[in-house]
């Protein structure tokens, strides 16, 4: 079979391009008939990359990191889009599909602090940089005395900002730091019991057009089954909640033998209440388990987790 050029769409940050390169290598490894020169990576600047000083919720939400890339995919300017799954809205875009995932990296959160100080040894009223409502509330659960402050930008930008006087520490995803080769910067790795991660954290997602059979047959060979099941459960929970970047929600699924386990946390909008739900079941019922988790969290929280607009 003769193949034309396959264009992979990606954000332009160093980390995003590493994700795209990883996806490209995986596609080539699992499709030996493809010549490496057939796959090209195209950088697409997203709204989230352009506006790096405001909260995502103030300028349009999670789709800011994916909408421009999806437009290119729908217009057939690219054939595949590579995303960090945690950046994708829970509702899929019409005529596009996200159901191929590379093997999940470590989903835990990490702390980078000045002078390499442990989280629990930071001085009273230290300022922690984060761009996530979820992290803000989880930090407050662990230490009410700490101050959280918005920080935006890519990993290098955030580390650079830490060198100034605004922040004493920042919290980031371990997967990104590891991928960038900056593990030596880590002051502490949080357990998932301390800080439950964002839905989809550590997962690279590959998106395509639903009706593009040739491309879908190529990319399905790289799909990691366990990661797929975990993503299915976590994202279904988020979908039921109608969760967006204003929703302080965490979720982590794991597969052990023939069972899937899903741990979830949801915070009220004022951060005063935390709702917890853990569920497990047969791994082939991942979506159903995610749905049940979402419904249970709503039954506990009511509308307390939503901003009245």
Give the role of each language-model region.
Residues 3, 46, 54, 60, ...:
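Mixed-charge, polar/low-complexity N-terminal
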Residues 71, 119-120, 160:
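Alpha-helical segments flanking ligand/cofactor-binding loops in enzyme cores
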Residues 2-52, 58-59, 66, 85, ...:
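Small-molecule-sensing regulatory modules
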Residues 61-100, 106-107:
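N-terminal glycine-rich phosphate/adenylate-binding segment common to multiple enzyme folds
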Residues 85-86, 94-146:
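A conserved helix-loop-strand patch within extracytoplasmic ligand-binding domains
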